[in-house]
């Protein structure tokens, strides 16, 4: 309202307000945040300032002028004992984001803050402001209190320009009471009734807070094994997966969506064939992705069509043999028919395990891209490659300078998220703060290729994929190293 052609002058520089707007609720919230001001009065003051700024004849606006108007209004309301209210360009927010109707509907349904009656009380811009403010506060922990506002602005611009987006729990929960910001967790499943249902309970808590869970059921004794304590017969891993699936059905993630799980079973578990076909009926285990944990020795046996041993995890004894080639073909056939199971290369994962002294990696997050130790969690985020095309030259090209900057800021954002997140279990908090893993990925690759006029199914596309991901990996490692120099190495480094 009335900001077109106006310029805000601050110590940081001159800012054209044409692309910005005054948001009544945002400034009202700023007023009420550190002062005992009734919400109705705070809103009246905010609307007063909006009108005064819009009606100004001068095209230049300074913060002292706004402050003078604010102080006069506070005196009028008898609010002379208020805390100092810092004014800067963040009191204006960017005009509406260019979001599709579908995107807006998803935001309204799952992400935007609602009041006790279910009424939406924030815009997409305010959601991003809430997230940016919360994540930037982590700078204080490292003695960078003066950088909080700077980082808030950088993070806000990243988000509103849709160049980077964090995982859903960060958008949902940052700056709110729940405060659980991580998307993916891995929980151990021990071979006892207590261990199994402890894991189920923990999974329910995580799902309620907005996270997804990965499990390895490989420690569970196979079906029809003797249970020493009762003299009964074990029902096997797949039966307990069904219990986990049913529980997941009943718990919405963060009160907004159903939970998600990953189940992994080692290829040498005696129940591996039952596991491979556990999702043959498409109405079962709908809250699980499943993957077979294969080993190097199994893959070698596949090449030679050799038999391999099945091992009972309860006692480590051989319980039978199967032909590796036949098992592999059964796996591929079932994956072709309905998409599950996938394959996880366990030995390959553990060769890259950065903290082998803490244990073996035996599972991943629900989508499979993030291997984690038992009782470990991770924050994820994605860079939107479609936003990094340079049109200044005759032929569109990738803007690697801008991409480098975004990688570095994204790494910092995700590292800050570790400190700002609340964790559903103390064991997870300890592991996360000890290892400080983050997951930085990409989206918009097809859109990038379209802008570069490169066919998706071409050798050139593969070449671009390798170049871009190699660049992102190299720069993210460099950014991580700088954070290590600045903040210290992660506690479990030694």
Which residues make up each language-model segment?
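Extended catalytic cores of very large enzyme megasubunits
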Residues: 1-494
